[in-house]
Amino acid sequence: MLKKLDSLLSAAGIELPDQQKHQLIGYVELLDKWNKAYNLTSVRDPMQMLVRHILDSIVVNPHLQGSRFIDVGTGPGLPGIPLAIVRPDAHFVLLDSLGKRVRFLRQVQHELGLSNIEPVQSRVEDFAAKPPFDGVISRAFASLQDMLSWCHHLPAKPEGRFYALKGVRPDDELATLPEGIVVESVVRLRVPELDGERHLVILKSN
């Protein structure tokens, strides 16, 4: 699996220290193991997990600004855990409402020794951001409007950002954003061996 990860990282132009590579592989191994009983992801093949979960998450890293983030609707820790592994200097709250997912996140935290993640079981509307976050990250929301509606209380004002991971560029959604929200950028992400487009939408309050 290390050989495959090295190949993907090289194709994406990403360099990581060996410790982070081994942590990423350890995460995939845990996800594969727990997935058999807990059905955490529809991706069954660990090699595909490297593409669709690991690379698809860490390509976001160069675009993150700040050091305190929340991954909303993180599921089994995506994109939060891969990002936390490659950003040991930053702190990530991993928020999900489902107990089995949060139990898995705590197991990953324990086994991989990740001191910079904080798994939390909560509905997003019930979670108090104290202090507010530099960035709110998610690939769980169906629409940008949903993300802004549910997560409006989480980022610091005015410098906090929303980072939405999307497939095709969501031009229809971008055209109907609520007042007071500006599009800082829409970045096309390059994920080796991933079919389909990936975009990162970065939004701010003005």
Curated annotation (Swiss-Prot):
Lineage top rank: taxon: Bacteria
Subcellular location(s) per record: Cytoplasm
Major place of residence: cytoplasm
Keyword set includes Transferase: yes
GO MF term (any one): rRNA (guanine-N7-)-methyltransferase activity
Enzyme Commission code(s) on record: 2.1.1.170
UniProt entry keywords in alphabetical sequence: Cytoplasm, Methyltransferase, rRNA processing, S-adenosyl-L-methionine, Transferase
Classification via SUPFAM superfamilies: S-adenosyl-L-methionine-dependent methyltransferases (SSF53335)
Residue intervals passing through the bilayer: none
GO CC terms in record: cytosol
Family, similarity comment: Belongs to the methyltransferase superfamily. RNA methyltransferase RsmG family.
NCBIfam families xref list: rsmG_gidB
Function: Specifically methylates the N7 position of guanine in position 527 of 16S rRNA.
Protein name: Ribosomal RNA small subunit methyltransferase G
